[in-house]
Amino acid sequence: MNKNIFFTAMAALMLSACGNQTKQQPETVGKNTASTEPELIFVRGPKASDKLFTGTAYVNELVPKSDSTAYAIGDVVFEPGCRNNWHTHQVRQIILVTEGKGWYQERGKEAVPLKKGDVYIIPAGMEHWHGATKDSRFVHIVVTDYQDDSCVIWGNPVTDEEYNTL
């Protein structure tokens, strides 16, 4: 069932990305992005900012936002115990889990466990965080929609007290 959701979401994304395009030449964005680490699909990106993540994370910008797109696609690797800060997207975000176990939590609600194969759509304006469980690496592809040139408002870190209650 999760594979069907994953492939349906990817097909819908590809169709929506192609739907408003005029005739253009194909563009290769991610040459040599395949990972040599057998459990990872894409090569690790650079280490993420300590100001936005607690713990170690790597962000690989697979498809950057451009003048012709209203979204960006990234691959994020969270090492065990790592999580990003509370944040809000002005437009929705889609999480496609490709490895491991993680958490997604909206402010004031119970955390939702995420695992390989899960697809999660985060509505616009929802303050939330996501990251790895204490004992598992967590990897996801994120499709982040933009409103003009902005996509996220960053908040405070998820405290150890908040995280350790999971």
Show the residue positions of the predicted features.
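Positively charged n-region of N-terminal signal peptides that target proteins for export
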Residues: M1-N4
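Ligand-binding loop in jelly-roll beta-barrel domains
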Residues: W103, A124-C151
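A short, N-terminal "cap"/entry segment at the start of jelly-roll beta-barrel domains
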Residues: Q21-A70, I153-L166
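Short acidic-glycine-tyrosine-enriched beta hairpin
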Residues: G108-G125
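C-terminal motif of bacterial Sec signal peptides marking the signal peptidase cleavage site
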Residues: S16-A17
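Short, conserved beta-strand element in jelly-roll/cupin
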Residues: D75-E79, H89-Y104, V143-D145
